[in-house]
Amino acid sequence: MNMNELVFIDDFDNHVVIMSEVVMRLNSYRQTHYTSTESGGTLIGERRGQHLVITHISEPGQDDVRNRTGLERKGIHHQQKVNDLFQQSNGFIVYLGEWHTHPEDFPHPSFIDIKSWVMGIVATEPMIMLIVGRKDIWIGKKIKNDIKKLKKKMVS
């Protein structure tokens, strides 16, 4: 395992691994300046039994509407990236959830975040919700309408 990967676990010791390339891309969107706008996209990767591996993300595009504390993903490129990777992998790489940034050091979901995740993401499989803050990442797993924060696993 690469030391730059992030690993999180749920209450049942199911893992969510964020590959190092994805960690680097997510970190590049941290809102470190007072003029930085919110960024976001889709989380894409592999389902390995009860474990999830995030291997790719879609990134902000010119059609997305972004401001300091809000984001509307309007670009069709987000879905196109999911579709392309799904086809290239013969259905092995799939949509796993959503990510976006917050202009705070230690992020947590807002009421709007939770409402949009519960209402907007309908899936029979567990989905991942991720918020990139200036110093830390908040990550949760959505199963049906229940969202639980995951714990960071220390990797030796």
UniProtKB/Swiss-Prot annotation:
What top-level branch of life does the organism fall under?
Answer: Bacteria
Provide the GO MF annotations for this entry: metal ion binding; metallopeptidase activity
Record note on what altering E38A does: Loss of defense against phage T4, T5 and T6 but not lambda, P1 or T2, increased conjugation of DncV to cellular proteins, no cGAMP production in vivo during T4 infection
Q: TM segments?
A: none
Which first-to-last residue range defines the signal peptide?
Answer: none
Give GO terms for biological process: defense response to virus; proteolysis
State where Zn(2+) binds: H100, H102, D113
Q: Which cysteines are joined by disulfide bonds?
A: none
Q: Where is this motif: JAMM motif?
A: 100-113
UniProt domain MPN: residue ranges: 9-147
Positions the record marks as coiled coil are: none
Q: Which UniProt keywords apply?
A: Antiviral defense, Hydrolase, Metal-binding, Metalloprotease, Protease, Zinc
> In the Enzyme Commission scheme, what number(s) does this protein have?
3.4.-.-
What's the top EC group for this one? hydrolase
Positions of the catalytic residues: E38
Keyword Protease in annotation = yes
Gene3D superfamilies tied to this protein: Cytidine Deaminase, domain 2
Induction (record text): Part of a CBASS operon consisting of capV-dncV-cap2-cap3.
Quote the Pfam families the UniProt record gives: Prok-JAB
Print the miscellaneous field: The sequence of this protein is available as NCBI RefSeq accession WP_024167427.1.
Role of this protein? Metalloprotease priming reversal component of a CBASS antivirus system. CBASS (cyclic oligonucleotide-based antiphage signaling system) provides immunity against bacteriophages. The CD-NTase protein (DncV) synthesizes cyclic nucleotides in response to infection; these serve as specific second messenger signals. The signals activate a diverse range of effectors, leading to bacterial cell death and thus abortive phage infection. A type II-A(GA) CBASS system. Reverses the primed state of DncV, the CD-NTase, cleaving it from cellular proteins. Cleaves a Sumo-DncV-DncV fusion protein precisely between the 2 DncV moieties.
Tell me its family: Belongs to the peptidase M67B family. Cap3 isopeptidase subfamily.
Xref: NCBIfam families: ICE_VC0181 (TIGR02256)
The protein's name in its UniProt record = CD-NTase/cGAS isopeptidase
Q: Which species?
A: Escherichia coli (strain TW11681)
